[in-house]
Curated annotation (Swiss-Prot):
One of its GO terms (cellular component) is plasma membrane. SUPFAM superfamilies: Proton glutamate symport protein. It is a multi-pass membrane protein. This is Serine/threonine transporter SstT. One of its GO terms (biological process) is serine transport. Disulfide bonds: none annotated. GO terms for molecular function: neutral L-amino acid:sodium symporter activity. It is found in: Cell inner membrane. InterPro entries: Na-dicarboxylate_symporter (IPR001991), Na:dicarbo_symporter_sf (IPR036458), Ser_Thr_transp_SstT (IPR023025). Pfam families: SDF. Keywords: Amino-acid transport, Cell inner membrane, Cell membrane, Membrane, Symport, Transmembrane, Transmembrane helix, Transport. It comes from Pseudomonas putida (strain W619). It comes from the Bacteria. The chain crosses the membrane at residues 16-36, 45-65, 79-99, 138-158, 175-195, 214-234, 295-315, 327-347, 353-373.
């Protein structure tokens, strides 16, 4: 083995990612032109993760259910409740923060031509239609709701198959997992390319005009990540939640921050769940499910930007409306993965609660795209790290009760 490979094997992946991050920042500041050219490293890494994620979820969930033995327990229901509780709590935090530190937006008359869903019913309808999508189409377009539906259906059907068939499915699962491990080893190079090209292309100039709004958004996400989520985890596992919380933020959140894709971070979360020794039948389903419906960061984005528009227009907000907004934001956030453009294009839906016309609401969406470099990164980091955090908390709570 060459000396370089020996050093790489001895150095942890997180350390390598931090080195790649620092090198990317340095290159963007010193040689922006070269940094832009090296952006293809990030594109290749994200494309590889996105390519392998649907296949991984499909094979892993199908294998997990097909090889599930009678008497084995999975803990999906408590994890699902944690996802919903975490998303609603995040929306409440965002409402409180927006009331304490109201943001103002410079809304102009410029037209923004984007297509947003017309109501909550349409979002839910899109989710149902995604669930019954053609399986090949679902895999090609990374429709994880459709992929999960077909994986669960085939898994249940194959539970009655012969032992040989189930062994083949398990071997396929192991093969795909090995490919994912190889892809993840290239994370430092990918993040180096992503950071260097993003900073060289956008810089930080575009963000300076929205510092207050960004401070409220990022502050809410940090509060949820470092206070609310640990409180929920403590309630579940009844011991110091911070070692687990910080581990998930370090191992999952950092990668998600730079890939800006919950789907692309699924392999990272699955690998972390395996290292934590969690129940495979549980995490192989809960992690892809979390990437679809566990959207605390999206709930914060929808709430903060909606209330920023409300404060800018001078619309009064009473307590019942604030509570309703929290509920709507939580439901919309759960449907964010079913909408192209994610949480930002669901803002007009929340704005409709206050009678804000679509033209103004879409200007708020445009503001969201301007600050998206940081907003989307922080949102994805919170969403994705919470998937593995709540999965680990539920599994550890079950182990504590069984002991």
């Amino acid at each position: 083995m060459s000396p370089l490979l020996r050093v790489l094997n001895r150095t942890s992946l997180v350390t390598q990612i931090v080195i790649g991050l620092i090198a990317g920042i340095a290159l963007a500041l010193l040689a922006p032109a070269i940094a832009l050219d090296l952006g293809f490293l990030g594109k290749v890494f994200v494309s590889a993760l996105k390519a392998v994620a649907p296949v991984l979820v499909f094979i892993l969930v199908m294998a997990s259910i097909a090889n599930h033995r009678h008497g084995q327990e999975t803990h999906i229901r408590p994890i699902l409740w944690l996802y919903l509780l975490g998303t609603f709590s995040a929306a409440v935090v965002a409402v409180v923060a927006s009331m304490l530190f109201p943001s103002q937006l410079a809304l102009s008359a410029g037209d923004v031509t984007l297509s947003a869903p017309g109501g909550i019913g349409e979002v839910l309808q899109n989710l149902v239609l995604s669930a019954v999508d053609n399986p090949i189409n679902a895999l090609l377009n990374a429709n994880f709701i459709g992929v999960l539906t077909w994986a669960i259906g085939l898994g249940v059907a194959l539970r009655h198959a012969g032992e040989t068939t189930r062994t083949v499915v398990e071997d396929l699962s192991n093969g795909v997992t090995l490919i994912v491990r190889v892809v993840i080893r290239f994370a430092p190079l990918g993040i180096f390319g992503l950071v260097s090209s993003t900073l060289a292309q956008s810089g930080l100039d575009a963000l300076l005009g929205y510092l207050h709004l960004l401070a409220v958004l990022i502050g809410c996400m940090l509060f949820v990540a470092l206070v609310m989520n640990p409180l929920i985890v403590f309630w579940k596992i009844r011991r110091n939640p911070y070692p687990l919380t910080l581990l998930c933020l370090r191992e999952s959140g950092i990668t998600a921050f730079f890939t800006r894709s919950s789907a692309a971070n699924i392999p990272v979360n699955l690998a972390l769940s395996e290292r934590l020794g969690l129940h495979e039948d549980t995490y192989s389903v809960s992690i892809p499910l979390g990437a679809t419906i566990n959207m605390a960061g999206a709930a914060i984005t929808i709430t903060v930007l909606t209330l920023a528009a409300v404060h800018t227009l001078g619309i009064p907000v009473d307590l019942p409306t604030a509570v309703l907004l929290s509920m709507v934001a939580a439901v919309c956030a759960c449907g964010a993965s079913g909408v192209a453009g994610g949480s930002l294009l669901l803002i007009p839906l929340a704005c409709s609660l206050f009678g804000i016309p679509s033209e103004i609401a879409m200007q708020v969406v445009a503001v969201g795209f301007i600050i998206g470099v940081l907003q989307d990164s922080a949102e994805t980091a919170l969403n994705s790290s919470t998937d593995v955090l709540f999965t680990a908390a539920a599994c550890q709570a079950q182990e504590r009760r069984s002991a």
